[in-house]
Amino acid sequence: MGIVVIGAVFVDIKGYPLSTYIPGGRNAGRVEQVHGGVSRNVAEDIANVELRPTFVGLVDDTGMGLDVIEKLNNHKVNTRFIQRVPYGMGTWLAIFNNDGDVCAAISKRPDTTPLIGLLEEQGDEIFRDCDSIALELDLEKETVKQTLRYAKKYGKKVYAVVSNMSIAMERRDFLQQIDCFVCNQQEAGLLFSDDYGHLEPEEMCRVLAANVWSANIPCMVVTMGDKGAVYAQADGDCGIVPAKKVDVIDTTGAGDAFFAGTVIGLTYGKTLAESCEIGSRLAASVICITENVCPRFRPLEFGLDVPVVD
């Protein structure tokens, strides 16, 4: 069944200025509406490496919801476990500056409680034969608990990402049961009640290693934008992964692609350092295009001996 990805679907509304962006002022520009959401992006990123993930989530019972399912199907994502419900998708509104970075954003989260019933009814079928689980940690607490129970039952690795750290903080204790947690530098500061914005990778790496040990978190990766990423494991192993140098067009989805690449590597036999390198390559490929997911790759390009199923 490949990697199972569990999470929410969003509609991304993105505004780009046509001239110099003026904070607080009126800006002429263009507005785009695309399918988004951390987990939806992750599922499509995995599929774009010619792997065949399964997406477990919700969409609206509207034409837009059908469009989301159809696009995922076209990318060879298994959509059997996507439910269509009223208000099943959230909305993310973002304004970009001239460097392609988000300078303001606001989101409306969907109601994901129907996932609880879905996992109760079909959880065994979903998780029994999967290769690993990629989980959006800020889902309903019961959904996270259910996923971790199934993972323990069937001996599956669980990798977690977050879209709203304020909500995920309420699930902080679950991190001790997560095989690897990926977040950005700002989110790491929230997680450990500190400010890491001024830290360079070398110092961030040392701080992270101390934190995962004291918090009993098995493994954690922190992305640092154009400074790359750092990783640390509870056994003391830690390191730095430099960022790829590319021309920035749109940073949307770069973190999701990094997470997808890291999960792919860890699932199919790579070390944590090698997996982060795959994540770094996928993130770089997203930054230099207007799409919020990576372009098509083949597993062999990342040294993965995984059969491509057409």
Q: Which stretches of residues belong to each language-model region?
A:
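A glycine-rich helix N-cap at a beta->alpha junction
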Residues: 71-86
